[in-house]
Amino acid sequence: MIKERVTPPFQASGGSGVVMAESHIISSEAPPKSNPGLNIRTNCRMILNLLREKDCSVTFSPEQPLTPVTDLAVGFSNLSTFSGETPKRCLDLSNLGDETAPLPTESPDRMSSGKLESPKTQFVQFDGLFTPDLAWKAKKCPKRNMNSVLPHLLCSTPSFKKASGGQRSLSNKENEGELFKNPNCKPVALLLPQEVVDSQLSPTPENKVDISLDEDCEMNILGSPISADPPCLDGAHDDIKMQNLDGFADFFSVDEEEMENPPGAVGNLSCSMAILLSGPLLNQDVEISNVNNISLNRSRLYRSPSMPEKLDRPMLKRPVRPLNSETPVRVKRRRSTSSPLQPEEENCQPQRRGTSLKKTLSLCDVDISSVLDEDCGHRQLIGDFSKVYALPTVTGRHQDLRYITGETLAALMHGDFNSLVEKFFIIDCRYPYEYDGGHIKSAFNLHRQDEVTDYFLQQPLTPLMAQKRLIIIFHCEFSSERGPKMCRSLREEDRASNDYPSLYYPELYLLKGGYKDFFPEYKELCEPQSYCPMHHQDFREDLLKFRTKCKTSVGDRKRREPEFRLTGQRLG
């Protein structure tokens, strides 16, 4: 009986990536020597049966084997930096300690025994890039679909040495091994032009291979590209056609425009980085012409940092004022302040077309100066509006009262107005202790309102001559509070006792400055010639007592009689 020991049919030797199938027939008995060819065929059939039972793919096919460059192209079929997909596997850089790149080697069986004469049983491949399953599935993949699988970017390989005799032929096996084993220069660029790829990957007739690959096959990615500059190789490659590739036509029928202009901003970058770098740049410069097109009427609370600081914008919201500055508000104000007594010069102006409405006369249309002049004319008249004031008057603190100076009072006392005045009365409205401290000669001390009312209105006095007048003059210490109150009280009572405008005492006066200003200048007209102020230290109790009586008398009078106040009315 024959015992067989089958080694793994696809075993990599020395990390060179060469996969071969070995079979060793160990027999306890010597093999038959009659027909050695039949024995070999029998052994091969047994090996094939074992492989089929274990679902293993055959390493050889009736098609031509892969050349090193073809295997390299198939290995990088999944390497595409422009597809935007994440690589399925990263490059293992643990074996890259040496500067030389990993070199493809031939199978150990051929190197040792050399029994495999047919080129169909020999192919070269990188370790980790091609598995036996791929060769089995290659028949199922159509060649037409491989154009999308072909990478736009090839891995970096050593640059070829320039040959003195011209371009090296790939059919020369000695030169082929020399090209891949002894790189003497830096790695070349990754993105090869189309004609270079065609020239370097064109196989010889004896090494023609039909390659097909499934898009779903999992491939190991060696690494990322290094540069995008194409290498400079000697030789003319324009005469080489795509149909000479014999199996590579579908793979390398890449558009030249797509190869020259990568679909990204940078050819050796991924899709996301290419989109970022090839996108429109944001310009930070702002042109003034573009800014001027923006509406200037729009208010901006915050200025954008990218906008320039100085823009040709007006300072006001309305930079150009209208030519016609006559607004309805201004016209109304001008008409309200105009006088109706103005000359009719404005009528000469051309009238506006259309119906014009005439404004009714109101107090605002009357000139205020004419009203004041008219009032001044009435103010010169006495209380019953029958005559003018006999004594010269001055303005004082209270506009409704008539003031005279101390000089006028002294002249009246000296008899300078006897032709006009029949009799005059000087009423001292101060408290009794003030009156006793010093007062004007012939003055009456009446510090309460009821006393003044009883004295003048119970039995009214009349002048003996119609041309003569009765004059009453009020004063207090300063003629600021008590004297004006007493004067107004008498006028109110007099108005209440007569029909308007008749009065018993139409001519009332108030001494300006009071006794305080009159005493220093006319002491001879005062008796005793002294001055006692209201807030004297010796008369505090008297001050409180008289104030209380004055308030009580005023309250009683208001309760007895109805109150007739003429606040703000002219008293004459």
From Swiss-Prot:
Residues 95-117, 304-354 are annotated as: Disordered. SUPFAM superfamilies: Rhodanese/Cell cycle control phosphatase (SSF52821). Keywords: Cell cycle, Cell division, Hydrolase, Mitosis, Protein phosphatase. It catalyses: O-phospho-L-tyrosyl-[protein] + H2O = L-tyrosyl-[protein] + phosphate. It is an enzyme of class 3 (hydrolase). GO terms for molecular function: protein tyrosine phosphatase activity. The keyword Repeat does not apply. The active site is at residue 476. GO terms for cellular component: cytoplasm; nucleus. Its EC number is 3.1.3.48. GO terms for biological process: cell division; G2/M transition of mitotic cell cycle; positive regulation of G2/M transition of mitotic cell cycle; positive regulation of G2/MI transition of meiotic cell cycle. Residues 420-527 form the Rhodanese domain. It comes from the Eukaryota. The keyword Cell cycle applies. InterPro entries: MPI_Phosphatase, Rhodanese-like_dom, Rhodanese-like_dom_sf. Belongs to the MPI phosphatase family. This protein functions as a dosage-dependent inducer in mitotic control. It is a tyrosine protein phosphatase required for progression of the cell cycle. It may directly dephosphorylate p34(cdc2) and activate the p34(cdc2) kinase activity. This is M-phase inducer phosphatase 3.
